[in-house]
């Protein structure tokens, strides 16, 4: 009896791993960079304080060069 229970468990686990039991079971890919809502100041690179430009550069990877 234990052998039957073990085999049923292994078979159901194999089906779940292959995606037959509940459809799509693969993990979703993670984004390469964290997704943040960017402040408007990062896109407008003139007329913003240098602290805002520095924050955008370090936090979002967008370096605003002030001219």
From Swiss-Prot:
Places the protein is found: Cytoplasmic granule
Residues with the Arginine amide modification: 66
A GO MF label: chitin binding
InterPro entries: Penaeidin (IPR009226)
Keyword Disulfide bond in record: yes
Gene Ontology biological-process entries: defense response to bacterium; defense response to fungus; killing of cells of another organism
Signal peptide location: 1-19
Record carries keyword Signal: yes
GO CC list: cytoplasm
Primary location group: cytoplasm
Disulfide feature: 42-56, 45-63, 57-64
Keywords on record: Amidation, Antibiotic, Antimicrobial, Chitin-binding, Disulfide bond, Fungicide, Signal
Family that this chain belongs to: Belongs to the penaeidin family.
General function of this protein: Antibacterial and antifungal activity. Presents chitin-binding activity.
Protein name according to UniProt: Penaeidin-4a
Organism annotation: Penaeus vannamei (Whiteleg shrimp)
């Amino acid at each position: 009896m234990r052998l039957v229970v073990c085999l049923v468990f292994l078979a159901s686990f194999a089906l779940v791993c292959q995606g037959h039991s509940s459809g799509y079971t693969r993990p979703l890919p993670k984004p390469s960079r964290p997704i943040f809502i960017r402040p408007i100041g990062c896109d407008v690179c003139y007329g913003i304080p240098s602290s805002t430009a520095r924050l955008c550069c370090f936090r979002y990877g967008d370096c605003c060069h002030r001219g």
